[in-house]
UniProtKB/Swiss-Prot annotation:
This is Protein translocase subunit SecA. The gene is secA. One of its GO terms (biological process) is protein import. Pfam families: P-loop_SecA, SEC-C, SecA_DEAD, SecA_PP_bind, SecA_SW. May bind 1 zinc ion per subunit. One of its GO terms (molecular function) is ATP binding. SUPFAM superfamilies: Helical scaffold and wing domains of SecA, P-loop containing nucleoside triphosphate hydrolases, Pre-protein crosslinking domain of SecA.
Length: 925
């Protein structure tokens, strides 16, 4: 009661924000007359003046009134569209890093130009994020005229569809016309598109480009700039609906099967070393599960590889271009010598199954990494499986939080305001409509069966068509829209079907969905982003007249459109029919929001049945008993506010369930995200630094100190030293042949510290000899290439290990441990081990690699680039719905569901890793 009293006196927070912004609107309006008096060149010159003021120390906030006034004047002149006052408020909300909820038809695309122009003045770039490629192209070409008039450049990023990253990026150029191309969008490189002041693109492409940039081997291969400001259109769809699944770039792990088979034929020809310093090609360290080639073995292996055509004449195993061969040889040696059939693994049904060394049980679904599993498959003659390995991954939550400033706009965000605030720190501000909303949202009609419901929908469509009222029927799945389409065909009712597949065709159909008597079936996302204009799209009709239409033709088209527009208005505007409730109230509101744009009349109604998924799972028993008590007959419907409220409560449960899934995903991904930031920052510094020799020198000392300490513990006496072991590992791992035992015999006063320093000195001298041979410049290139290769290789393996850890961590709940805490602890330990391995392997490779000429450095670089771009796959799965299975692709045959994991009992720990019982967590539903 106190809260409502305070709200009556002071207004809600939303009202106070809108009222405060209204004062700035008045200041913008005061500038209008002055700007209208300027010619086009003088208006354009204002952009340069504003940039100078910003560079001189003025804030964006101080420039906002003039920048918004300039944008509005450009819109009026170039496009005949003057921003309304409420649109100015929407622009200010975007600039302040909030979400603007604006009803459908209120001109969100135009609103974005205000905040985009202001923030582009800094020269750091603005990203406008859309839900599909077509909308990115359409909006860039449409609004590009406005930006171009103000001297700003506009880029577009589209999906390349596997044709190379530079094959689908454009710059707005009013002088560009191409046969079969997109009007005024000139193809350019991706980097040029990102260098534009404002860049339009989809959330997937912005995310994938970020990941690709962090896999680049040269600075010039990176395309994005610093992530400055993003305006996310349809922000609820992108930051909520699509945020349940991460973006993943994957590729085949390891080489093709042929390489493993060829190595498999080489290894049996090598002989073991029976005793230390004795003859033989390799020595075995069973304790560490490692195999080392002797000098004789290295020469023999090189000759066998030359005979097999794997090595060129004069090329060595430790040459810069042969690192991949060395990796394969090591895997094959371990497979043949250290891993034994029926001890370490079983061969069953053409597969290698790992045996747990502690329990003796088969570890189903597990595979060894680093090419070992494939090497064992080659050894046993079973089919060699090319694994898909995650090369890079990020969730939308963590990608969009990288922007210095983030904002968004949508017609429906208020129901998810809590999540936007919790996850992204974004406040939702509801913007008032320019004209009062007059749409009639009618009560839901609930039927006993789906058959009765669909009959009622067809009857309603017939009624609307007879009175020439346009109808949009929303469905929750492709299956439902196709079923309804079949019923309409039987009833001989002409209609269009949209299934969110062909975005460009959809937009054209949706433009005409407001014609008198038009019937359109659409899934919830189909055609989103395109307004349904009553009477049809006048702009689309005028476009058919060509570039220089006759005035008489233009007048005729306008008169015809006005006649249709008035007819639809008289018949009640657009009527929305919902064929079932969606799992989220927000999606239902999106459907309703298609009608009643800009004060137009319109109506909406949902038709439900007790057999609908939402009703069946959550509300059917109570509603069914009520309907039976009322003595409902077949074909009769119940229309009651209590039923509508019960359905909304069910939707709230599903929304809470989906929020938990997203929050849970984020809590786990935050752990990986902290590590990702460290690795990507390290990688970026590597690319930007010309000379990393000092860093590598410090790393080499650090690694050698660790190795020496394993065999000569600090503060120990000489009798405790393992000199043969140290000598062996320095030679095998680092190529350092040192007579440490001889030094100790000859020099009685050789202390531990002096010995350590001498080893470091010999390592530095050996490295300097290598550098003198090829030159400092070539060595610097080799250092960067090796560092990048090792970093990337280990990071990929680390991602796979993190995936395995994540999959099994929920089981820790059985041991009364908090799975999330366990995951954080183990992930941190794994990351520390990763950094140690990277340092060791970089040092070992650089000490052993044989570089003869600058051409070797180029060969290593070419090998890296080829490996990096080979067979990449870009994946962003659609999140699974609680109520609907994902839509099957065309031509796919439905497969029966087979449970791969045991069913979760109500008293078992929840699968999500929260540590709660299933019935108290996600089992509550």
């Amino acid at each position: 009661m106190v809260t409502s009293l305070v709200r009556k006196i002071f207004g809600s927070r939303n009202e106070r924000i809108v009222k405060r912004l209204g004062k700035t609107v008045a200041r913008i309006n005061e500038l209008e007359a002055e700007l209208q008096s300027l010619d086009d060149e003088a208006l354009k010159a204002r952009t340069g003046q504003l940039r100078e003021r910003l560079a001189g120390g003025e804030s964006l906030e101080a420039l906002l009134p003039e920048a918004f006034a300039v944008t509005r004047e450009a819109g009026r002149r170039v496009m005949g569209m003057r921003h309304f006052d409420v649109q100015l408020i929407g622009g200010m909300v975007l600039d302040s890093g909030r979400i603007a909820e604006m009803r459908t038809g209120e001109g969100k695309t135009l609103v974005a130009t205000l905040a985009a122009y202001l923030n582009a003045l800094s020269g750091k770039g603005v990203h406008v994020v859309t839900v599909n490629d077509y909308l990115a192209r359409r909006d860039a070409a449409w609004m590009g005229r406005l930006y171009h008039a103000l001297g700003l450049s506009v880029g577009v990023i589209n999906s390349s569809g596997g044709a190379g990253p530079d094959s689908a990026s454009y710059l707005y150029d009013p002088g560009f016309h191409a046969e079969g191309g997109i009007a005024h969008l000139r193809p350019v490189t991706r980097r040029e598109a990102y260098a534009a002041d404002i860049t339009y693109g989809t959330n997937n492409e912005f995310g994938f480009d970020y990941l690709r940039d962090n896999m680049a081997f040269r600075l010039e291969d990176r395309v994005q700039r610093e992530l400055n400001f993003a305006i996310v259109d349809e922000v609820d769809s992108i930051l909520i609906d699509e945020a349940r699944t991460p973006l993943i770039i994957s590729g085949p792990a390891g080489e093709s099967a042929e390489m493993y088979e060829r190595m498999n034929r080489i290894v049996p020809k090598l002989t073991p070393q029976e005793e230390e310093e004795g003859p033989g090609d390799y020595s075995v360290d069973e304790k560490m599960k490692q195999v080392f080639l002797t000098e004789d073995g290295q020469e023999k292996a090189e000759q066998l590889m030359r005979d097999a055509g794997l090595l060129a004449e004069g090329q060595g195993l430790y040459d810069a271009g042969s690192i991949a061969l060395l990796h394969h040889l090591n895997a094959a040696l371990r497979a043949h010598i250290l891993f034994h059939k029926d001890v370490d693994y079983l061969v069953r049904d053409g597969q290698i199954l790992i045996i747990d060394e502690f329990t003796g049980r088969i570890m189903a679904g597990r595979r060894w990494s680093e090419g070992l599993h494939q090497a064992i498959e080659a050894k046993e003659g079973v089919p060699i499986q090319r694994e898909n390995q995650t090369l890079a991954s990020i969730t939308f939550q963590n990608y969009f939080r990288l922007y210095e400033k983030l904002s968004g706009m949508t017609g429906t965000a208020d129901t998810e305001a809590y999540e936007f605030q919790q996850i992204y720190g974004l406040e939702v501000v509801v913007i008032p409509t320019n004209r009062p909303m007059v749409r009639n949202d009618m009560q839901d009609l609930v039927y006993m069966t789906q058959k009765e419901k669909f009959e009622a929908i067809i009857k309603e469509i017939k009624y609307c068509q007879e009175k020439r009222q346009p109808v949009l029927v929303g469905t929750a799945s492709v299956e439902t829209s196709e079923y309804l389409s079949g019923l309409l065909k039987k009833a001989k009712i002409a209609h269009e079907v949209l299934n969110a597949k062909q975005h460009e065709r959809e937009a054209h159909v949706v433009e005409q969905a407001g014609r008198p008597g038009a019937v359109t079936l659409a899934t919830n996302m189909a055609g989103r982003g395109t307004d349904i204009v009553l009477g049809g799209s006048l702009e689309a009709e005028l476009a058919t007249l060509g570039d220089n239409p006759k005035p008489a033709d233009v007048d005729r088209v306008k008169a015809d459109w006005q006649k249709r527009h008035d007819e639809v208005l008289a018949n009640g505007g657009l009527h929305i029919i919902g064929s079932e409730r969606h799992e989220s109230r927000r999606i239902d509101n999106q459907l309703r929001g298609r009608a009643g744009r800009q004060g137009d009349p319109g109506s909406s109604r949902f038709f439900l049945s007790l057999e609908d998924n939402l009703m069946r799972i959550f509300a059917s028993d109570r509603v069914k008993s009520l309907m039976q008590r009322l003595g409902m007959q077949e074909g009769e419907a119940i229309e009651n506010a209590w039923v509508t409220k019960a359905i909304e409560n069910a939707q709230r449960k599903v929304e809470a369930h989906n929020f938990d899934i997203r929050k849970n995903l984020l809590e786990y991904d935050d752990v990986a995200n902290d590590q990702r930031k460290v690795v990507y920052e390290q990688r970026r510094e590597l690319l930007e630094t010309e000379d990393i020799s000092e860093t590598l020198e410090a790393v080499r000392r650090d690694v050698l100190e660790g190795v020496i300490s394993q065999y000569i513990p600090q503060g120990s006496i000489e009798e405790q030293w393992d000199v043969p072991g140290l000598t062996h590992v320095l030679e095998q791992d680092f190529g350092l042949v040192l007579d440490i035992a001889g030094w100790l015999e000859r020099e009685d006063d050789l202390h531990e510290e002096t010995l350590r320093e001498r080893i470091h000195q010999h390592a530095a001298e050996a490295y300097q000899v290598k550098e003198d041979k090829v030159g400092a410049e070539t060595m610097r290139r080799i250092e960067k290439d090796v560092m990048l290769q090792v970093l990337d290789s280990h990071w990929k393996e680390h991602l796979a290990a993190m995936d395995y850890l994540r999959q099994g961590i929920g089981l820790r709940g059985y041991a009364q441990r908090n799975p999330k805490q366990e995951y954080k602890r183990e992930a941190f330990e794994m990351f520390e081990a990763l950094l140690t391995r990277i340092k060791h392997d970089v040092t070992a490779l650089l000490m052993r690699v044989q570089v003869r000429s600058p051409e070797d450095a180029e060969a290593l670089e070419r090998q890296q680039r080829a490996a990096a771009g080979a067979d990449m796959r870009f994946q962003h799965s659609q999140p699974e719905s609680v109520l609907h299975k994902p839509e099957a692709g065309e031509g796919e045959e439905a497969q029966p569901f087979r449970r791969e994991t045991p069913k979760v009992g109500r008293n078992d720990p929840c699968w999500c890793g929260s540590g709660k019982k299933f019935k108290h967590c996600h089992g509550k539903l």
